[in-house]
Amino acid sequence: MEDDSLYLGGEWQFNHFSKLTSSRPDAAFAEIQRTSLPEKSPLSCETRVDLCDDLAPVARQLAPREKLPLSSRRPAAVGAGLQNMGNTCYVNASLQCLTYTPPLANYMLSREHSQTCHRHKGCMLCTMQAHITRALHNPGHVIQPSQALAAGFHRGKQEDAHEFLMFTVDAMKKACLPGHKQVDHHSKDTTLIHQIFGGYWRSQIKCLHCHGISDTFDPYLDIALDIQAAQSVQQALEQLVKPEELNGENAYHCGVCLQRAPASKTLTLHTSAKVLILVLKRFSDVTGNKIAKNVQYPECLDMQPYMSQTNTGPLVYVLYAVLVHAGWSCHNGHYFSYVKAQEGQWYKMDDAEVTASSITSVLSQQAYVLFYIQKSEWERHSESVSRGREPRALGAEDTDRRATQGELKRDHPCLQAPELDEHLVERATQESTLDHWKFLQEQNKTKPEFNVRKVEGTLPPDVLVIHQSKYKCGMKNHHPEQQSSLLNLSSTTPTHQESMNTGTLASLRGRARRSKGKNKHSKRALLVCQ
C-alpha cells in the first residue's frame, strides 16, 4: 500500500568519501557521516545547498515560498464563536487556534487555493478556507462548524484536541499534493502547510573513538515536550536538546571506524518553523491520567539556544494561541482556547462564548498546546491590518445577545446526548479518516520492544466502534468513573466548574499520545561518495 502519511518519510544517508553518487533521489531525510572536521568547517558546495536550503534535492517544489501572502487580509477584530454540536469542544478549540494563525488565515482569505483546486470533494483546504472566512467575517455571531471538518474523526464522544489538530493539519497538507501524480517524499515537505508549521530536527552522533560525526535530519510539524521534571517550557526544551551519552550496551556502531564505541548524541532544531506548535505531554500513555501541574510559558520565547547554529542572534517567537484542557484525564474534561486577534487583544474562545481576556490570565493556564509565531512574521502580518472593522471587545452583553438568538443550548452542550449525522456516519465517502491516518503513522514509526501494559476495555453491545484508541482505558463495566461519565439528561444546568465534557463513552477508551518530540519515519538510504 502506498504510504500517504503526511509528515512521515524516509531517511537520507550521506557518506563522505571520494566521489559523489546517488541511488535514491526521492528520499526525504538526510544523514551525513564524515570523519572528524573542525567545528565550523564548511561542507562541500553540493552538500551546503542540500542541507541549508532544502536538506535534499527536490524533484518538484509544490508551493514556492513567495506564494505565502505578504500582506494581511484578516479583520482586526475577533471573529465568531463556534456552536458545540455535542462533545465537540475539542474541535472548536483546535479550529479557533488554526483560525488565528496569521499566515494560514491570510492564505485562506486570499482564496488562492479554491480558485485552482480541482478536487470535487473531500478537500480539507477548501473546507478550512470556508470555515476561516466565515469565522473571521462574522464577529459577534455564533456559527456552526462544517461537519466535513470532523468527518472521519468525530463519533459523538470526547476526543483528544491535539490529535484532531494534527489530523487536520495533515489533511490540509495532503490537500496540497497533486493526487494523480507521484510525489517524492521530500517534495511533500515543500507544501504550503509545511512552510508554515514545518521544520527539521538535527540528530548528531559524535563517535568518541574516531571523532566521526553522523547527522540525521527529520521533518517535524509539532514538538512534544516532556513536563514530568520541567517547571517551564524552557526547561523542557533544555532537556530535549541535552546531550545523551551512548556507551556500554548502548554503544554506537560507528560508520566511520566501523566498530562499537562510546558516542555523544545531541538533538537540536536545524531549521525553524514560521509557526511553532508545542504540545505539553500532560497525559499518561498507559492510563490517560493527566499531569495537572503548572508549567510556566512565556509570552516571548527565544528558540536560538535550541538551534543547531547558536551564534546567529536571538530567534524570538511570540505567543498567539493557547489550547487548554480542564479536567482530570484524557477520558473526560472540557477544551477551550485563548487567541490573540490581529488588533493585539486576547480573547477566550469557549465554544459559543467569546470574551475579552488579558495576557495575565492567558499565562496562568494549565496549557496543553502552545502556538508561537516568529516575531518578525507577526509584525509583518500586523503592519497591514484590514481597516474594515473597528477593534472591539466582546463581553457579557454580546454573550447574552447570542443566547437570546437560540444559538446557545440550555445545558452545556458537552453534556448533551450526541446525534450522529448521516454525513458523519458515511465514513466511506471521506478521503481522510482517523483510522487510516493512525495506520499510516503506526507503519512508519519505530516499534517498541515490548508493551508495558495492554488492557482491554468492555463496550456495551449496542455501541458501534468507529475508531479505536492506541491504548485501552482499562475500565470494567460499571466502573465508578465510567458511571460518572454517562449522560444524565435530567440534570440541571451545570456551573462553569462542573461543565466538563464527559461524553457518552468518554471514560471507556483513551487517546494515545506521541511519546517523542519528533516523528520518526521509515528509513530510506542513499549512499553518496566523493
From Swiss-Prot:
Residues 382-413, 509-530 are annotated as: Disordered. Its EC number is 3.4.19.12. SUPFAM superfamilies: Cysteine proteinases (SSF54001). One of its GO terms (cellular component) is endoplasmic reticulum. PROSITE patterns: USP_1, USP_2, USP_3. Residues 80-375 form the USP domain. It is an enzyme of class 3 (hydrolase). Its main location: nucleus. The keyword 4Fe-4S does not apply. Keywords: Endoplasmic reticulum, Hydrolase, Nucleus, Protease, Thiol protease, Ubl conjugation pathway. It comes from the Eukaryota. The active site is at C89 (nucleophile), H334 (proton acceptor). Deubiquitinating enzyme that removes conjugated ubiquitin from specific proteins to regulate different cellular processes that may include cell proliferation, progression through the cell cycle, apoptosis, cell migration, and the cellular response to viral infection. This is Ubiquitin carboxyl-terminal hydrolase 17-like protein 11. It comes from Homo sapiens (Human).
